[in-house]
């Protein structure tokens, strides 16, 4: 039995279990993927409660916290300063970041060229991964916004030197930053409730708006962006692509993001997680 898990806040609504169970069932694999609620400082206790695992994912707010549990880090996790995937190794947990790849490849479904200016809203692990992906892809300027500005400034400092100008958005400057950006990314939890959005207005016509929130698919953020003439990219593509990357890390197998997305959509239609 291959035992996998997801740790984080609000994980009961995650579609990850449906994705991995669907993949395993199609291939006749004996695999379980369970979710464990864990808040700040709660990863290590939750891991002990879960028992022996082959690997696991972490989501908000644990992606930075998970760094301290890794015996080794891949180059992306080290540069981003966040982990979302772990696999058991000979000397302990090996940490990976597959979020950046999930984000970047989902964006590349809609554009072949890096943006001149991109705005990432949210400076946690997911936001850092998006900013890293944009900077290393060749974006000219990457703006990072956070609620207080403190984590945005820290992320901008940590991600400097990747080939792009990485700058924090000053307090009160979010709408101006959105208006100046070719790509706008929501890397916050705002939208899970189907009501909230980090940006009410200010989208530049013709921009690409990427939401890491995938439930609902048409989030308030994406609806407002579409109404302003922007191309919306739902968060389910990122989830499916990074899941394919995780399967390669954990099992050494190839997986189609299109197939994995189908399992998630089936679960959404059936009201399952």
Swiss-Prot record:
InterPro entries per record: Aminoacid_DH-like_N_sf (IPR046346), NAD(P)-bd_dom_sf (IPR036291), Shikimate_DH-bd_N (IPR013708), Shikimate_DH_fam (IPR022893), Shikm_DH/Glu-tRNA_Rdtase (IPR006151)
EC number: 1.1.1.25
Subunit record text: Homodimer.
UniProt binding sites for shikimate: 14-16, 59, 84, 99, 214
GO BP terms in the entry: amino acid biosynthetic process; aromatic amino acid family biosynthetic process; chorismate biosynthetic process; shikimate metabolic process
Catalytic activity reported: shikimate + NADP(+) = 3-dehydroshikimate + NADPH + H(+)
Gene designation per UniProt: aroE
The UniProt record lists the keyword NADP: yes
Originating species: Aeropyrum pernix (strain ATCC 700893 / DSM 11879 / JCM 9820 / NBRC 100138 / K1)
Designated name of the protein: Shikimate dehydrogenase (NADP(+))
